[in-house]
Amino acid sequence: RNLFSKKICLLWLSSFKHHNISLTIRIVDELESQLLNNKFRNINKPTNILSFLIDENPIVGDLILCHPIIKKEARDQNIKIKDHYAHLLIHGYLHLTGLDHEKEKNAQIMENKEIAILKKLRIKNPYKSNIIK
């Protein structure tokens, strides 16, 4: 069954600051996520999302989402899977704009932007629960 409609996906994407953007969004299994994470980040385990910036102006990038991980996280956090997908798409997009969460200060900036965008979409703050980073 469809996880989200084209209409919902376009609504999420329209909340982004940059309108001149080209994204490829792929949904993969755990094996492919692990292979990509290992190849590009030297982390030999699957992850919920990977972001790959191809070009900065305009933003061109790939977002790779791992459905089994996202489904498990949504279940574990007792949130709607569609809301978790929206959060991760926004999270990945923010990485493409140059934000990261490696340092606490940067993490707070990124989280605040995520929360603000999600609020516009009427999605609750994911950091009030035990979100997996």
Spans of model-derived segments:
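An acidic/histidine-cluster motif and surrounding catalytic segment
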Residues: 1-86, 96-133
